[in-house]
Amino acid sequence: NVDFFDPSTKLESDEKKLLQKWEINKEKKIILMPGRLTSWKGQELFIEAVNLTKIELGYEAFHVVILGSNQGRDLYKKKLVRLIEQYRLTKQIKFVNHCKDMALAYKVSDIVVSASIEPEAFGRVAVEAQSMEKLIIASNIGGSNETIINEKTGFLFESGNAHSLSKKIIKAITMDETSLKLLGKEGRKNIIKKFNVEKMCFSTYSEYKRLLN
């Protein structure tokens, strides 16, 4: 819904409240990885890439928020925590179980990552992030190939490759603000063009018509 995921509808006061709740300083870049905690969503790969990025850029360069419930997958969550501890990333990576306003979560972030290691038919995160004018970094499988214009509205990385993901994160973090905002604007234009209600209704109607004929 491009009207709900619209950056102009979010208040600065609400952004500040969310950042206070998350105990995050906005002076650093914020990388958001939304999605339930499950192995195929690629959280392990993402943590590996964050470690590689930290080695390249240093501890102080960015914050990371992994946003999503483990839905009872306690062993998997513990595995992720151990990996974070192993890489000494506990001060940099924060788990957030739930956010009732996902559009606001995107708004306070600078970069959004979708690191799925199995293809997703649609890939909602990539669409929502672009709609919120945020740079999206996603694996080059599944729906992301269709919804992201590589290097124009986001970055695609080689699926399953932590080094490839890290390179894209570093590229995003080191972009100047003007380029970052321009890329975000292109992302929203892309999503409005592809997914406005009238176009989706027409596409659905055309598909039904084709099937009936």
Question: Where are the predicted features?
Answer:
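Active-site donor-binding acidic/aromatic loop of nucleotide-activated sugar
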Residues: G72-K77, L89-C99, A105, F155-L156
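A short, well-ordered alpha-helix in the C-terminal region of glycosyltransferases
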Residues: Q20, S164, K171, T178-K194, ...
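Short beta-strand->alpha-helix junction loop in the catalytic core
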Residues: N1-S8, Y205
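A short helix/loop element that forms part of the nucleotide-sugar donor recognition site in Leloir-type
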Residues: P7-I24, L80
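Conserved acidic donor-binding segment of nucleotide-sugar-dependent glycosyltransferases
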Residues: N150-E151, F155-A162, K171-E177
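A conserved mid-protein helix/loop that constitutes part of the nucleotide-sugar donor-binding site
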Residues: K29, M33-I55, K78, H163
